[in-house]
């Protein structure tokens, strides 16, 4: 599960605690401006919170980009509004939005436009008061390992926080008068100052780690790393680099485990002492903190074993991205959208193995029954899947292209003489299907069934027994068909001795064979006449 539970709890607390200050602002409006305006403020806060949650939960990243572009300015505006509300509660002054003195009929809305204004003010304050930059950057640079565990932890943490706020504030504001403030709720100085203290405490928690460096440098770094502006600046993100060793020897470089999959398995990593972490501003630092389990330094054997499993046997990034689309809880950087060439090569290898089933996995004698006119061509090699075989079969790419042209451009025919019908059937090798524009999962490809080979003889039969059986069959055929050799030659003997395929056509018989056949016919006629003298007459 790696860091899924921790990230779920942190994100749940972040989304739950983010509207702390807006909740206090809604309470302030309820106390100083009336129940109806307080209810609109609470409704706007809830609507803003649900909207922000939906933007991230359903992966509407491009809408979040617009919010992230102006986040520093929104933080400043939200802070000014919350501080003003805290001062109003502390000194018991009338709010700048207050239109009438409290009393009978106080707090009533003058028009629908005014009610919409109160609702939108609380709705916008929800986006102007994030957990400074800590919330958005934690959301951007944290990737859960198990989405189900992550969502479970996120839901538990988030629901608990929201339930507490609703039970303590929202329910009472929408229900009866808040009993904690009594009948004179707007005139109790001590009670109202509690709201001011709560607002200041919420601001202190949210801006505890906020510095000018975080508002400027870190935000600019994340802006270039996670949004469409990443093409404006050449930068390194999410990884570490291999530095040259002390003796200036050449060392291999690897930035992240994702880049490792595209580059292939490394056979030599170099000494661990040559590894130096160089975080690039805030992006790589947060990635190292949140994904230390993923960024491990192992020995060459262990690392190659893990990389080999991940690349050839385990789930790859293409499938992982397809599974996590509905729960895209982080902005997808540019490198996530690139084509994974290794993934396409894996699909091609799967397709090649499926096509190879067309050539039966059997003995050469059995395969010969369904193969083309040559028994030396066992299978066709895809050199893109198996490039190491090119040196054995074709010395150059030109020779390889000629081989492919020959195989693809030749129509193979096979006749079913062994079945006795002598019918020509056109056949060819299966070709790799073009990959679709959007590759989903490997098992979406159609299954190619292997060719069914009919074995004519038992594996326990010997050549002598087969030949003896063939002689007996020929004698029976000679007797029942009267003169079989006038029609065709001995088919079974021809297959056994010569292994030649082709249509069986009538042929002329020489004089010696003709004389022998005539003698046999006369002998049978004389034997028949001598045994049946009456019928002969």
Curated annotation (Swiss-Prot):
<keyword id="KW-0150">Chloroplast</keyword>
<keyword id="KW-1133">Transmembrane helix</keyword>
<feature type="transmembrane region" description="Helical">
    <location>
        <begin position="115"/>
        <end position="135"/>
    </location>
</feature>
<keyword id="KW-0934">Plastid</keyword>
<feature type="transmembrane region" description="Helical">
    <location>
        <begin position="197"/>
        <end position="217"/>
    </location>
</feature>
<protein>
    <recommendedName>
        <fullName>Uncharacterized membrane protein OtCpg00060</fullName>
    </recommendedName>
</protein>
<feature type="transmembrane region" description="Helical">
    <location>
        <begin position="40"/>
        <end position="60"/>
    </location>
</feature>
<feature type="transmembrane region" description="Helical">
    <location>
        <begin position="63"/>
        <end position="83"/>
    </location>
</feature>
<dbReference type="GO" id="GO:0031969">
    <property type="term" value="C:chloroplast membrane"/>
</dbReference>
<feature type="transmembrane region" description="Helical">
    <location>
        <begin position="149"/>
        <end position="169"/>
    </location>
</feature>
<keyword id="KW-0812">Transmembrane</keyword>
<feature type="transmembrane region" description="Helical">
    <location>
        <begin position="5"/>
        <end position="25"/>
    </location>
</feature>
<keyword id="KW-0472">Membrane</keyword>
């Amino acid at each position: 599960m790696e860091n899924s539970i921790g990230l779920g709890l942190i994100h749940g607390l972040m989304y739950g605690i983010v509207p702390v200050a807006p909740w206090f602002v809604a309470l302030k409006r309820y106390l100083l401006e009336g129940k109806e305006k307080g209810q609109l403020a609470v409704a706007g806060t809830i609507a803003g919170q649900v909207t922000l949650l939906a933007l991230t939960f359903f992966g509407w990243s491009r809408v979040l980009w617009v919010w992230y572009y102006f986040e520093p300015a929104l933080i400043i505006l939200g802070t000014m509004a919350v501080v003003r509300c805290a001062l109003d509660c502390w000194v018991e002054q009338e709010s700048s939005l207050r239109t009438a003195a409290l009393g009978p009929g106080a707090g009533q809305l003058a028009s629908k436009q005014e009610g919409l204004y109160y609702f939108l003010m609380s709705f916008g304050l929800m986006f102007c008061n994030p957990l400074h930059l800590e919330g958005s950057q934690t959301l951007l640079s944290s990737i859960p390992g198990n989405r189900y565990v992550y969502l479970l932890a996120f839901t538990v943490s988030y629901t608990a926080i929201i339930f507490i706020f609703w039970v303590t504030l929202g329910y009472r504001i929408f229900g009866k008068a808040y009993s904690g403030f009594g009948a004179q709720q707007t005139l109790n100085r001590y009670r109202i100052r509690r709201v001011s203290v709560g607002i200041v405490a919420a601001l202190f928690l949210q801006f505890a780690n906020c510095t000018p460096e975080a508002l400027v440098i870190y935000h600019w770094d994340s802006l270039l790393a996670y949004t469409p502006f990443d093409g404006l600046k050449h930068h390194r993100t999410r990884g570490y680099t291999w530095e040259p060793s002390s003796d200036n020897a050449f060392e291999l470089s690897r930035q992240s485990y994702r880049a490792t999959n595209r580059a292939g398995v490394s056979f030599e990593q170099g000494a661990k002492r040559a590894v130096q972490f160089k975080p690039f501003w805030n992006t790589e630092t947060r990635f190292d903190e949140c994904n230390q389990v993923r960024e491990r330094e192992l020995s060459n054997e262990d690392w190659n074993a893990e990389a080999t499993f991940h690349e050839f046997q385990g789930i790859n990034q293409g499938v992982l991205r397809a599974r996590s689309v509905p729960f895209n809880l982080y902005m997808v950087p540019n490198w996530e959208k690139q084509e994974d060439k290794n993934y396409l090569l894996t699909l091609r290898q799967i397709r090649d193995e499926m096509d190879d089933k067309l050539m039966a996995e059997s003995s050469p004698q059995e395969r010969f029954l369904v193969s083309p006119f040559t028994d030396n061509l066992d299978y066709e090699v895809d050199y893109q899947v198996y490039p190491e075989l090119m040196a054995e079969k074709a010395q150059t790419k030109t020779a390889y292209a000629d081989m492919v042209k020959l195989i693809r451009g030749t129509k193979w025919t096979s006749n079913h003489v062994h079945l006795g019908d002598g019918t020509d059937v056109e056949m060819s090798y299966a070709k790799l299907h073009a990959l679709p524009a959007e590759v989903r999962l490997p098992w979406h490809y159609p299954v190619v069934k292997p060719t069914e080979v009919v074995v004519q003889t038992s594996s326990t039969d010997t050549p002598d027994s087969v030949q003896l059986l063939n002689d007996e069959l020929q004698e029976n055929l000679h007797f029942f068909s009267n003169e079989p050799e006038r029609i065709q030659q001995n088919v079974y003997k021809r297959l056994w001795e010569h292994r030649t395929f082709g249509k069986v056509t009538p042929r002329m018989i020489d004089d010696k064979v003709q004389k022998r056949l005539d003698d046999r016919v006369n002998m049978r006629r004389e034997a028949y006449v001598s045994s049946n003298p009456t019928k002969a007459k």
